[in-house]
């Protein structure tokens, strides 16, 4: 058959759509597979990373459909977010139009790959019906006390009068106008993800062996559970007087109470309330005030990369055990949103504290015996050891001292042992237009009130001006002004919108609900119970922390709110590698982008699919290779050229093996080994190593071509098309329909007789070194194996005495000799 990809691919894409071939069934008695690739942002064009991600998921989905599983394999669009607003400013287009136009373009591109998505479950997160239920979840969480409002510091561009995301701050300046960014305190909405910290951490254990260990480690570190001591440093009388009595003490947390006697100063975040009060009162020199203001305007993520700096505050605190006066400093390495925003500094036993103390000539005090460690003049000793200079705790080992010091603090009401987490509550409000409106009303009489469910969804006004200056919703009085749902009085809407990570934290649950129920149900209880969890979730490892953690958290919240019974949303996680060209990630700036549309136009979708699945294992980086693409095309063409040897049949041919030649048996063996490998690949035994499966298919086609028995060729072709269907579906369906009436797209079982060999290769070693090989019939006796082996390696036995003979049946002969 002549290979014409354009005609074949268009034909079968229309067939699958018209026949609803890829839609999930409502029959919950069937075994199910939920295969999901992370949904894309509708940027306008797909890239090769998309192609790889979706071809991996599609191959898995197609395989399990062929195995008679009920498969849910949906697609949707993560459609809210900042790029749409940026495009509106740049191109003078509305974010809504820009977004939906991009969705239309990208869906056409994805369709051209022959991806077997469910068309009837597709949605965009900017669809009002999706926002309706997200707003309902927000209200439920607000009423449950899981969402609260407080002031927080945000990146603020004074020129554009707008909040900037961290990624919009480039070296401390606004990405758009190059104005220096400042930190501005504003009200924000936070979700209490910390209420679930222990469960989020503990249930990672249930994902061992099913998620990549690297992702599990990253989440454990991000949650950051630590046990330690929480206590207060009280200010000295003179310090309290200096600050006008507005502060009496400040809290700290330490995981090293065994070093407490080594505290020589305390460091506070530049944004700490005590520091801000000092600044407000003007109790610091102008130089110090300017230095603090500069520190406060550096985003937290950039502080870790700059030299450590501090400002002496002219205040002192009382050491709770020694009574000594400890100086207070503001330091740029202390973050206000981690712990209490204040730390006890032990320069002798903490590297960061040591570096800061060296810079500002602050004292250090050794309280842990360092043994053979370097001099404390050169570096801090950070390991455990025996306590010294620690009063009544001298001589204790660190672990014992930690317990006793915590107990001492608790017995004397000085502090308490606590479990702390690095994880912070999730700030979900954004001062932007293109996002899900937060469903809260500000009433002068009633305070902050959730909107009535009957008024949901709160939709965005379309008559807005997006110019990059301020929040368009804040400047839209007709939309902003409303009635309080509680008292009916005049009120105003909340103008913040939700972080787009909220949308992607539950979309996988939404897919389980049939489209006809989207208006009336957030989730269909029976359907989500049947489909969840996602059997295979596919996406980049860059989502290991935020998206995957938020999705796990949101699932647990919805469980507690009664929407689902699922504890963990993703049963298995596959993190695919990046697509590289010339050793670097593809990007327009590097000029190394490969356009998927051009690739499909030239070679066809099946070639693109075959290449991305063959060039590297899914979890590894894929290096682009033009000649390998051409090789993939040649293989498909060769597959089509071989149809002259195929007989038309409606079932798997029965082969009489007794009369087969060695070449014919070898061809059958290779084909059935390929079928066996397919079973292993899709069972996750080797992380979906499609590359090895495709290589086996190529070898099998070669073996079939080396023999002339049409029955053998037909059987092999019948099986190979079935194995290749998830990978190159268009040509597989075309050939299968022509010769087998699609009868081979069903579960096939390897023939155990075909897998057997007439002979086995036996390795021969002499004194442990391989010296030769022999061919033996399976099940040959030890005596026969020894005789053949000795003949094969006779030259290595000359002048030697055999002192030991070791035979491993069907595998090995080892001869131990000496002169």
From Swiss-Prot:
One of its GO terms (cellular component) is cytosol. It catalyses: tRNA(Leu) + L-leucine + ATP = L-leucyl-tRNA(Leu) + AMP + diphosphate. InterPro entries: aa-tRNA-synth_I_CS (IPR001412), Leu-tRNA-ligase (IPR002302), Leu_tRNA-synth_edit (IPR025709), Methionyl/Leucyl_tRNA_Synth (IPR015413), Rossmann-like_a/b/a_fold (IPR014729), tRNAsynth_Ia_anticodon-bd (IPR009080), Val/Leu/Ile-tRNA-synth_edit (IPR009008). Pfam families: tRNA-synt_1_2, tRNA-synt_1g. A motif ('HIGH' region) lies at residues 40-50. Keywords: Aminoacyl-tRNA synthetase, ATP-binding, Cytoplasm, Ligase, Nucleotide-binding, Protein biosynthesis. Its EC number is 6.1.1.4. ATP binds at residue 588. GO terms for molecular function: aminoacyl-tRNA deacylase activity; ATP binding; leucine-tRNA ligase activity. It is found in: Cytoplasm. A motif ('KMSKS' region) lies at residues 585-589. One of its GO terms (biological process) is leucyl-tRNA aminoacylation. SUPFAM superfamilies: Anticodon-binding domain of a subclass of class I aminoacyl-tRNA synthetases, Nucleotidylyl transferase, ValRS/IleRS/LeuRS editing domain. Its main location: cytoplasm. NCBIfam families: leuS_bact (TIGR00396). Belongs to the class-I aminoacyl-tRNA synthetase family. HAMAP family: Leu_tRNA_synth_B. This is Leucine--tRNA ligase. It comes from Wolinella succinogenes (strain ATCC 29543 / DSM 1740 / CCUG 13145 / JCM 31913 / LMG 7466 / NCTC 11488 / FDC 602W) (Vibrio succinogenes).
């Amino acid at each position: 058959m002549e290979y014409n990809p354009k005609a074949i691919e268009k034909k079968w894409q229309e067939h699958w759509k018209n026949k609803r071939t890829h839609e999930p069934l409502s029959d919950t008695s069937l075994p199910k597979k939920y295969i999901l690739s992370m949904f894309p942002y509708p940027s306008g064009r797909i890239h090769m990373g998309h192609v790889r991600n979706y071809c991996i998921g599609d191959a898995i989905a197609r395989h399990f459909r062929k195995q008679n599983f009920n498969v849910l394999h949906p697609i949707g669009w993560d459609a809210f977010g900042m790029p749409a607003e940026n495009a509106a400013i740049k191109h003078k287009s509305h974010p809504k139009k820009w977004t939906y136009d991009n969705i239309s373009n990208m869906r056409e591109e994805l369709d051209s790959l022959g991806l077997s998505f469910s068309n009837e479950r597709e949605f965009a997160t900017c669809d009002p019906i999706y926002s309706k239920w997200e707003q309902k979840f927000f209200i439920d969480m607000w009423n449950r006390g899981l969402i609260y409002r407080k002031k927080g510091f945000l990146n603020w561009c004074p020129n554009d009068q707008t909040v900037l995301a961290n990624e919009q701050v480039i070296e401390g300046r606004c990405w758009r106008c190059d104005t220096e960014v400042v930190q501005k305190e504003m009200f924000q909405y936070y979700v209490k993800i910390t209420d679930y910290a222990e469960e989020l951490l503990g249930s990672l254990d249930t994902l061992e062996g099913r998620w990549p260990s690297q992702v599990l480690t990253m989440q454990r570190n991000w949650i950051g559970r630590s046990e330690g001591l929480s206590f207060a440093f009280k200010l000295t009388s003179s310090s309290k007087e200096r600050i006008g009595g507005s502060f009496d003490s400040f809290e700290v947390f330490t995981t090293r109470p065994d070093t407490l006697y080594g505290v020589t100063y305390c460091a506070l975040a530049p944004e700490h309330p005590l520091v801000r009060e000092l600044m407000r009162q003007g109790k610091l020199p102008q130089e110090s005030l300017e230095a603090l203001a500069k520190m406060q305007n550096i985003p937290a993520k950039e502080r870790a990369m700059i030299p450590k700096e501090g400002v002496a505050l002219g205040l002192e605190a009382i050491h709770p055990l020694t009574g000594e006066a400890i100086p207070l400093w503001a330091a740029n390495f202390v973050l206000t949103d981690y712990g209490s925003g204040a730390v006890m500094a032990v320069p002798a036993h903490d590297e960061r504290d040591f570096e800061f103390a060296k810079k500002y000539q602050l004292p250090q005090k050794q309280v842990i015996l360092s043994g053979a460690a370097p001099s404390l003049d050169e570096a801090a000793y950070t390991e455990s050891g025996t306590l010294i200079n620690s009063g009544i705790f001298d001589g204790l080992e660190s672990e014992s001292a930690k317990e006793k010091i915590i107990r001492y603090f608790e017995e004397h009401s000085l502090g308490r042992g606590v479990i702390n987490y690095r994880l912070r509550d999730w700030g979900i409000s954004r001062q932007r237009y293109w996002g899900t409106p937060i469903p809260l009303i500000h009433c002068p009489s009633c305070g902050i009130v959730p909107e009535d469910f009957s008024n949901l969804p709160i939709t965005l006004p379309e008559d807005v001006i997006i110019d990059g200056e301020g929040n368009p919703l804040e400047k839209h009085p007709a939309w902003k002004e409303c009635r309080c749902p509680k008292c009916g009085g005049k009120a105003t809407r909340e103008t913040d919108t939700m972080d787009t990570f909220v949308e992607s934290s539950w979309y996988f649950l939404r897919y389980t609900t049939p489209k006809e129920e989207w208006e009336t149900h957030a989730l269909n209880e029976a359907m989500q119970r049947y489909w969840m969890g996602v059997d295979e979730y596919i996406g980049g490892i860059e989502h290991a922390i935020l998206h995957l953690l938020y999705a796990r958290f949101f699932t647990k919240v919805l469980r507690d709110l009664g929407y689902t019974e699922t504890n963990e949303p993703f049963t298995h996680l596959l993190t695919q590698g990046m697509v590289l060209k010339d050793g670097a990630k593809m990007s327009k700036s590097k000029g190394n982008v490969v356009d998927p549309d051009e690739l499909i136009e030239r070679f066809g979708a099946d070639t693109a699919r075959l290449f991305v699945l063959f060039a590297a294992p899914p979890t590894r980086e894929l290096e682009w290779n033009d000649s390998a693409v051409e090789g993939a095309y040649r293989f498909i063409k060769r597959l089509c050229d071989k149809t002259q040897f195929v007989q038309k049949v409606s079932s798997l041919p029965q082969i009489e093996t007794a009369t087969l030649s060695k070449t014919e048996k070898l061809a059958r063996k290779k084909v059935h080994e390929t079928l066996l490998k397919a079973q292993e690949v899709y069972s996750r035994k080797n992380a979906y190593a499609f590359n090895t499966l495709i290589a086996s298919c190529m070898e099998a086609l070669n073996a079939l071509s080396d023999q002339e028995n049409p029955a053998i060729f037909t059987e092999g072709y019948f099986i190979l098309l079935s194995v290749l269907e998830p990978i190159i579906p268009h040509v597989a369906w075309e050939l299968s329909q022509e010769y087998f009436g699609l009868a081979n797209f069903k579960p096939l079982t390897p023939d155990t007789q075909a897998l057997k060999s007439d002979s086995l290769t036996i390795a021969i070693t002499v004194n442990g070194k391989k010296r030769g090989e022999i061919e033996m019939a399976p099940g040959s006796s030890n005596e026969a194996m020894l005789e053949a082996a000795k003949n094969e390696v006779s030259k290595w036995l000359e002048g030697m005495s055999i002192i030991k003979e070791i035979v491993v049946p069907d595998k090995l002969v080892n001869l131990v000799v000496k002169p």
